[in-house]
Design a protein with these regions (language model features):
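A residue-level signal for conserved active-site and pocket-lining positions in enzyme catalytic cores
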Residues: 59-60, 111, 143, 213
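Metal-dependent nuclease catalytic cores that hydrolyze phosphodiester bonds in DNA/RNA
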Residues: 1-106
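Short polybasic amphipathic segments
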Residues: 15-19, 161-163, 226-227
Length: 227
């Protein structure tokens, strides 16, 4: 399978996307922060964020080196990634694949995995303490939309987060947002239609704890009723 290229240059140091005619494009992560997740890391110490970013970048580089040239240093996080790939039989096609609408936006997809001659899965590697599945869902939904614009004969099947932390790797499938929602995010300034019953982000980050707490409360309630 051969993927199409876009006339966009990515400067990794400055993290900028520029078309060959000089037009500067916006990245998807900045858009998500501005439109949907403005308080995602509010209150977090900048040093903590910087350390987390450095750790995440190191893991990304190791995974890319493994997929592209077979480099396999002794590292628990790389072992976790390789374990996920082997368990789910992910066939690496491309890393850091650049997609764009060539009008306003461009971004690099961490991983593209080949499914068959005209189908791929895409994935983003996350190294955060807790995985924000709603964020990844939006991020990869936009990536899938742009991917299919660049490659109209290839369909994106599944969207995955590959969550790696302290030597443990998990493959988590996330929902793909519909095209209307994605285009609304990309090309309108209207407020996003947010589900009023959706879990607030600060609670979503503690979802596992809340589920455990809810279960314990149900057990306690049954015990009280039995008295």
């Amino acid at each position: 399978m051969t993927l199409n290229d876009v006339p966009v240059r990515f400067d990794a140091d400055a993290h900028t996307y520029t078309m060959v005619d000089g037009t500067v494009l916006s990245g998807v992560t900045g858009l998500l922060k501005e439109r949907l997740f403005p308080t995602q890391y509010a209150g977090v110490d900048p040093e903590v964020l910087n350390n987390a970013a450095a750790y995440g970048s190191a893991v990304h580089r190791m995974c890319e080196a493994y997929d592209t040239v077979g480099a396999y240093p002794e590292n628990e996080d790389l072992h976790a990634y390789v374990g996920v790939k082997n368990e789910y039989e992910l066939e690496h096609l491309c890393s850091e694949y650049l997609v764009s609408d060539c009008e306003k936006y461009a971004s690099c997809i961490d991983k593209v995995y080949e499914v068959d001659d005209n189908t791929v899965d895409i994935a983003d590697i996350k190294t955060t303490y807790r995985l924000d599945k709603e964020y990844v869902s939006w991020q990869l939904s936009v990536y899938a939309y742009l991917f299919e614009k660049v490659n109209p004969c290839i369909k994106v099947r599944n969207l995955y987060a590959i969550h790696i932390k302290k030597g443990v790797g998990k493959l988590v499938q996330v929902e793909r947002k519909d095209v209307i929602a994605v285009e609304g995010l990309l090309y309108t300034t209207e407020p996003m239609n947010v589900d009023p019953y959706a879990m607030p982000s600060k609670w979503r980050e503690r979802e596992d704890e809340l589920i455990k707490y809810t279960h314990l409360m149900e057990v306690y309630k049954r015990k009280v009723e039995d008295i």
